[in-house]
Structures are given as structure tokens and as C-alpha cells.
Amino acid sequence: MESMKQVVVATKNMGKVREFAELFERFDLEVKSLHDFPHIEEVEETGETFEENAILKADSLSRQLNAIVIADDSGLIVDALNGKPGVYSARFAGEPKDDQANIDKVLQELNEIPFDKRKARFYCALAVAFPEGDKKPVIVNGTCEGFILEQRRGENGFGYDPIFYVEEYKKAMAELSSDEKNAISHRGRALRKLEEKIPEWFLGE
């Protein structure tokens, strides 16, 4: 019997790993994460765009592991802050990464800016890299539009979810159930685009 084809997700975030595992198990693809390869060092994100960082991570790890690797780079883009925090979303308030400090910094920088001028979006770039040298990395992306609230709301999610207002639900992202969030989130939308490509990219159909 042929063993299941493996896909490595370039993250240690188990929430992300579960999202990918649910998608890929429908196609008999086994998902591994960086927890399964403790000797591998994290790739430094030196790109200037989400796409560059996702490709950088996927390509480097694919060559190291000789495996198909999926990497995502995502973050928050706030129009009134000229696109910040952008690719620096995870470390906006500096090292070490701290979600609460990042939220505080965004709220501070938007102080006294009215709600209708606080337009923002979450952006996710997903890159897939293949160990075969002749196959270039491929990429999909997804966005979720909203506004930045003046204070935190909700207990769910992570990152900037408590201050991101989703008009479709009239709630903060952190007030949504996981099903509601997956239906509209940037990563959920990118994953659905990826799902359409699985037969072609992963199964050679």
C-alpha cells in the first residue's frame, strides 16, 4: 500500500496546523508541522511583502526537508497608518512578540482618529514550495476588510482579533465563533483558494 503523501506546514502554531490538517485530510494528505522537525531553525522573514516572506519560508524549508512545504505570512494593514503594521504585525511593539502590546500600539497610534477613518484589512499570503528543483513556488492570498475598534471586544481568536471590527457580522473578530471566522477570515479565504488547487499542485491530476 502506498504511504500517504506528506505536506509540511511551516508553523508551530497548533491552531494553524489544525486548519490545514482539516483541509488536507479530505485528500488523503498527511500534515506535519515544525514541531515534527525540532532540529530545523526558523527562517528569518526579511521580505518586504507578505508574498516574499511566505515564499522565502516555504522555499527554504522545502529544500531543507526535501518535502512539499506550505508557509503563510499574514498581518494587519491599517490605511490611516500608511499600511502599518503590515509585514511587522507580529512584532509591531518590538521583541519578544506580544499580542497585547501590539494591540496597545495600534490603538495608541490611532488615538483621536474617528471610526470611519480607521479602515483596515487582514491579509494572508500562502506559498507552496516543492522539493523538485524545476517546480517554482506557487502562491494564493486572501483578505478580510474591516475597521479598527477603539477598545478590545471578545475573547476568541488571537493577534489583533479583539480590535478588528467585521461589518458583515457587526462584531469584533474575537467575538466570532470559529465557523463564523473561517467563513470570512483572510486565512479562510486563502485556504479555500488553496483547496481548489490541491488536485493540480499536490496530486498531479
From Swiss-Prot:
Catalytic activity: XTP + H2O = XMP + diphosphate + H(+); dITP + H2O = dIMP + diphosphate + H(+); ITP + H2O = IMP + diphosphate + H(+)
Database matches in Pfam families: Ham1p_like
Keyword Metal-binding among record annotations: yes
Chain sites annotated for binding Mg(2+): 44, 73
Cofactor(s) the protein requires to work: Mg(2+)
Listed GO biological process terms: nucleoside triphosphate catabolic process; nucleotide metabolic process; purine nucleoside triphosphate catabolic process
MF-aspect GO terms: dITP diphosphatase activity; ITP diphosphatase activity; metal ion binding; nucleoside triphosphate diphosphatase activity; nucleotide binding; ribonucleoside triphosphate phosphatase activity; XTP diphosphatase activity
Residues that coordinate or bind substrate: 11-16, 74, 158-161, 181, 186-187
CDD domains per UniProt: HAM1
Top-level enzyme category: hydrolase
Enzyme Commission identifier(s): 3.6.1.66
Active site: 73 (proton acceptor)
Entries under Gene3D superfamilies matching the protein: 3.90.950.10
Co-factor note (free text): Binds 1 Mg(2+) ion per subunit.
The keyword Magnesium is assigned to this record: yes
InterPro entries (alphabetical): dITP/XTP_pyrophosphatase (IPR020922), ITPase-like_fam (IPR029001), RdgB/HAM1 (IPR002637)
Cited function: Pyrophosphatase that catalyzes the hydrolysis of nucleoside triphosphates to their monophosphate derivatives, with a high preference for the non-canonical purine nucleotides XTP (xanthosine triphosphate), dITP (deoxyinosine triphosphate) and ITP. Seems to function as a house-cleaning enzyme that removes non-canonical purine nucleotides from the nucleotide pool, thus preventing their incorporation into DNA/RNA and avoiding chromosomal lesions.
HAMAP family named in the record: Non_canon_purine_NTPase
Similarity remark: Belongs to the HAM1 NTPase family.
Assembly information from the UniProt record: Homodimer.
Name this protein carries in UniProt: dITP/XTP pyrophosphatase
Species for this entry: Bacillus cereus (strain ATCC 14579 / DSM 31 / CCUG 7414 / JCM 2152 / NBRC 15305 / NCIMB 9373 / NCTC 2599 / NRRL B-3711)
Taxonomic placement: Bacteria, Bacillati, Bacillota, Bacilli, Bacillales
